[in-house]
């Protein structure tokens, strides 16, 4: 169950990862 949930979340979050990384780098 958790594996499937994680895969679904990863699919949804994947497009936003670059923006998140950029935001984190700006904060550091």
Curated annotation (Swiss-Prot):
Keyword Repeat listed: no
GO cellular component terms listed in the entry, alphabetical order: extracellular region
Cystine pairings recorded for this chain: none
GO BP annotations, alphabetical order: defense response to bacterium
Cellular compartments annotated: Secreted
Domain of life the protein comes from: Eukaryota
Keyword Transport: no
Main location (coarse class): secreted
Tissues of expression: Expressed by the venom gland.
Keywords annotated in UniProt: Antibiotic, Antimicrobial, Secreted
Purpose of the protein: Antimicrobial peptide active against Gram-negative bacterium E.coli MH1 (MIC=3.5 uM) and P.aeruginosa PAO1 (MIC=10 uM) and against Gram-positive bacterium A.globiformis VKM Ac-1112 (MIC=1.25 uM).
Entry's family note: Belongs to the ponericin-Q family.
Name listed for the protein in its UniProt record: M-ectatotoxin-Eb2c
